[in-house]
Structure formats: structure tokens, C-alpha cells
């Protein structure tokens, strides 16, 4: 079992590493490529576009051909794209490399969740996804620090060589450690069950909406945090870094505590707790009389996301024994596109950073609470929780 967990964790971590590792080198990259920092900030969106594009086909291929045939090319593409970015001499080539990086990371991301669905039952999967969420929270803190240390001695290209090295590690794990987990092709008698695993299932769609709104909350916070903390609240850059590190610490602590909470409380209870924390955060930020109270509201955001996201993802994947790859792709596409669409629309309409965050917090909590309370699984967990690998 440990081989599947290690490989899944490694496959997922390429995604946040590709986002956060290069940011510290952005000024030097812009200078060397004769581009403005504003022009290169689109590299974030290009990377996410690559991920979304990969998810359009990766899940279906993983269900038809296997998990390894998607993970291995995905890791290889991430390596090649990282090297391509390091050798880029124009901003256009650099952005093309970032898109290819996103394609590779997207393939690996989809496979990771499909593997966990193949190998873990609902309760264990919820615990593991909560742990994975905690580990993922470390990357936005450690990656810029590692990037800064690298750039003290080496040029910005070394950041992408570091990412390529990470990709090589994932490729080696996928080649030599990961075992295939895709369930055997269904017999004719199983075709009705395969056809019953519909993406239009009400319960699945409700969890798609809940996880997409939750990701929109956390990405809105990350995107607006410089404006909120430095421009509106007046913190210095060093203080901003400290606050973000502390919020990551809150996320990790709650994520690592959630598996223990699942041994005491029902998953539904934790999901309701998550949304109540979001609602409390939105109200706190809306009526906050001081910076201290606002910072408390921000910690509620991190705690709310960490306590409920892994549980919701686990529930979303639960009904899909034979189509876990497609389900994982659908979740990823919805989360990436939905959150990006909200942030873009809010900016176009002219909603300020503060109101943007408060709005998504309150909307997410109200909609999600209604879905949790009124959309129940269509059949008992035991009816669809088939695990294909136990060791």
C-alpha cells in the first residue's frame, strides 16, 4: 500500500511545485527575456490552461489504457518542458514551455487521484486526501524559499532544472515503483454497472460544485492576499511572508488532524464544519473592526478548506469504480476553470479584493451547506465502493 501512497503524493506535488518554484525568479526572467513582469505573470494562467487541457483527455486514457501509461508520459513531458523553459530566449518560447509543463502536471494530477480511488476505501481515502492536502500546503511556503536559496548561487534557469529533477524522481517512481491499479476491463455482465457510473449523477455533481467553490475560495485568497495584507492592511513584504507562512501552518495542522477527526466524526459533520468556518470567515472579514480580527478571519479560511476538501474529494470519487480517471479529470477541470472564471469575472466587473473574497466565502458556504444537507448518496457506500488493490 505504501508504494501507491508515495507515488500518488509525488504525482500530485508536481502541480504546486510548477506554480510556486519559479515565482522568486520572475524579475530576472523578465529582464533576460526582454519582457515585463506583467507580461510574464500570464505564465500562471498558461500553466493552468495546460493542466485543464491535459485533464480533457488524461482521465479517459487512464481508464482505457491504465494509470502508468498516463503518469509516465506526463512526468516525461514535465521534465522536457522544464528544460525547454530553462533554454527559452524569448517570452513566447517561455510561455510555450509553461503550457507544456501544465500538460505534464495535469496528467500526473489526474492519475494520482485515480490511484487513490483504486486502492483505498471511502474512509481511508478521506484520511489520505486530508494528509495530501496538508503536504500540498507546504509547497507554497517551501518552494519560494528553496528558489531563493538556489538563486543566491545560480541563475534563474537553475529553478527549472530543479523542477526537471523533481520530474525525473516522479518518472523513476512511475516506472519502477508504481504498479498498475486500473481495474480489469469489465465483462459483458459488468457493462450495466459501468454505464451506471454517470458523471451526471446528482451526488457527484453536488461534490463537483462544493469542491470547485472551495478551491475558488482558497485561490481567491491566494490571489488577493498581496493586496489585502500589504496595500489594504499595510504590512511590509517580510510581514506578509510571515503571515502567509503562518496560514500555511494552520492549513497543515488542520489537515494532519483531520484523519483523527474522521475516526470520531462522520464525514458529513466535517464537511458542514468546513462550510460553517467559511461562513464565519466571510462574516468576520465583513464586519472586522481591526487587523487582528481580519487575520483571525483569514485563519478560519485556511482551517475551513483543510477540514473539508479532502473529505469532499473522497466522496466525489466514491461512486466511480470503473471510471475513476474520468471522474478525477472532471473534478480537476471544474476546479481549475471554475476558480479561474470567478477570479477573472470579479476583476472584469471591478469587484475589489476585499469584497471578492467575502463574496466567494459567503456564496460557497450557503450553496455548499444546501447541497450537503439535501443531496445524499443515491445508494449506500457499500454498493459502489469496490477496491481493486489492497496491497
From Swiss-Prot:
SUPFAM superfamilies: MFS general substrate transporter. The keyword Membrane applies. It comes from Escherichia coli O6:K15:H31 (strain 536 / UPEC). GO terms for biological process: response to antibiotic. The keyword Transmembrane applies. One of its GO terms (cellular component) is plasma membrane. The chain crosses the membrane at residues 4-24, 42-62, 69-89, 93-113, 131-151, 158-178, 203-222, 245-265, 269-289, 293-313, 331-351, 356-376. GO terms for molecular function: transmembrane transporter activity. PANTHER family: CHLORAMPHENICOL EFFLUX PUMP RV0191 (PTHR43124:SF3), PURINE EFFLUX PUMP PBUE (PTHR43124). Residues 25-41, 90-92, 152-157, 223-244, 290-292, 352-355 are periplasmic. Confers resistance to chloramphenicol. Pfam families: MFS_1 (PF07690). InterPro entries: MFS (IPR011701), MFS_dom (IPR020846), MFS_Efflux_Transporters (IPR050189), MFS_trans_sf (IPR036259), Multidrug-R_MdtL (IPR023697). Keywords: Antibiotic resistance, Cell inner membrane, Cell membrane, Membrane, Transmembrane, Transmembrane helix, Transport. It comes from the Bacteria. This is Multidrug resistance protein MdtL. It is found in: Cell inner membrane. Belongs to the major facilitator superfamily. DHA1 family. MdtL (TC 2.A.1.2.22) subfamily. Residues 1-3, 63-68, 114-130, 179-202, 266-268, 314-330, 377-391 are cytoplasmic. It is a multi-pass membrane protein.
Amino acid at each position: 500500500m505504501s508504494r501507491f501512497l508515495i507515488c500518488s503524493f509525488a504525482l500530485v506535488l508536481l502541480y504546486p511545485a510548477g506554480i510556486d518554484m519559479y515565482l522568486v525568479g520572475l524579475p530576472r526572467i523578465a529582464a533576460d527575456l526582454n519582457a515585463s513582469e506583467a507580461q510574464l505573470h500570464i505564465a500562471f494562467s498558461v500553466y493552468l490552461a495546460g493542466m485543464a487541457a491535459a485533464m480533457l483527455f488524461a482521465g479517459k486514457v487512464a481508464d482505457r489504457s491504465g494509470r502508468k501509461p498516463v503518469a509516465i508520459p506526463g512526468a516525461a513531458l514535465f521534465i522536457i518542458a522544464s528544460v525547454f523553459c530553462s533554454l527559452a530566449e524569448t517570452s513566447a518560447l517561455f510561455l510555450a514551455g509553461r503550457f507544456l509543463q501544465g500538460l505534464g502536471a495535469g496528467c500526473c494530477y489526474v492519475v494520482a487521484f485515480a490511484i487513490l480511488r483504486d486502492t483505498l476505501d471511502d474512509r481511508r481515502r478521506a484520511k489520505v486526501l486530508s494528509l495530501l492536502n496538508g503536504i500540498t500546503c507546504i509547497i507554497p511556503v517551501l518552494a519560494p524559499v528553496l528558489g531563493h536559496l538556489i538563486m543566491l548561487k545560480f541563475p534563474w534557469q537553475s529553478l527549472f532544472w530543479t523542477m526537471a529533477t523533481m520530474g525525473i524522481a516522479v518518472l523513476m517512481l512511475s516506472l519502477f515503483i508504481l504498479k498498475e491499479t486500473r481495474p480489469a476491463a469489465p465483462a459483458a455482465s459488468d457493462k450495466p454497472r459501468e454505464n451506471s457510473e454517470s458523471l451526471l449523477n446528482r451526488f457527484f455533481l453536488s461534490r463537483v460544485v462544493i469542491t470547485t467553490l472551495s478551491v475558488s475560495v482558497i485561490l481567491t485568497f491566494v490571489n488577493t492576499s498581496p493586496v489585502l495584507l500589504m496595500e489594504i492592511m499595510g504590512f511590509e513584504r517580510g510581514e506578509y511572508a510571515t503571515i502567509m507562512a503562518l496560514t500555511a501552518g494552520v492549513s497543515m495542522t488542520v489537515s494532519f488532524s483531520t484523519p483523527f477527526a474522521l475516526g470520531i466524526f462522520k464525514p458529513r459533520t466535517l464537511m458542514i464544519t468546513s462550510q460553517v468556518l467559511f461562513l464565519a470567515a466571510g462574516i468576520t472579514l465583513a464586519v472586522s473592526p481591526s487587523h487582528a480580527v481580519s487575520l483571525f478571519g483569514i485563519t478560519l479560511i485556511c482551517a475551513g478548506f483543510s477540514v473539508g476538501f479532502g473529505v469532499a474529494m473522497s466522496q466525489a470519487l466514491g461512486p466511480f469504480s470503473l471510471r475513476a480517471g474520468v471522474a478525477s479529470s472532471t473534478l480537476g477541470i471544474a476546479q481549475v476553470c471554475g476558480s479561474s472564471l470567478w477570479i477573472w469575472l470579479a476583476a472584469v466587473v471591478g469587484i475589489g479584493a476585499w469584497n471578492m473574497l467575502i463574496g466567494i466565502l459567503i456564496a460557497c458556504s450557503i450553496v455548499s451547506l444546501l447541497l450537503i444537507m439535501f443531496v445524499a448518496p443515491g445508494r449506500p457506500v457499500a454498493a459502489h465502493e469496490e477496491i481493486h488493490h489492497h496491497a
